[in-house]
Amino acid sequence: LTQGYAVFDDPSMPVVGEGEEEPNDTFRKQLVANAKAAIDAVDELGYIDRSKVAVGGHSYGAFMVANLLSHSDLFAAGIARSGAYNRTLTPFGFQSEERSYWEAPEVYYNMSPFMHADKMKTPLLLIHGEADNNSGTYPLQSTRYFNALKGLGANVRLVMLPRESHGYAAKESILHMLWEQDQLLENYVK
């Protein structure tokens, strides 16, 4: 807030199932509703300018960021670090999704930001460790998503951090990540 904008950094937004529905059957709808409720609550307190709110996340949080930006106009920019953007590349389940791709193909498709790259209208910073060995978030996830977004004319930047895995450890990498995030926020949110 001291810089003139707000960032929802890795917010917790629960997605639940009701009755016979699995939680991910209505993932996008619940995710957007949760984000809107959070922004509404902070706005009601008088703390924010709704046009100057960004969202950021790491891993599953990055996946949520990409979905929020593709399916809402709530945010001025997004930061997605080491995420999974094409759920068909994790066909035997992920996080709370226990069904395989072949049991719930529409869920995998609907939850994959890659499949909705044409809807991205918000500036997005993708950051990924070149040596990410997390089976769901190999660097391929970010490079392919970046190529799709760029090919469709989206405002996107990809930063690959040398010799970094899923979490970043080198001081240089952390400082560079912070600088990249600051540049995005200064240019598109402030």
Describe each region flagged by the PLM.
Residues 1-190:
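Serine-hydrolase catalytic core recognition
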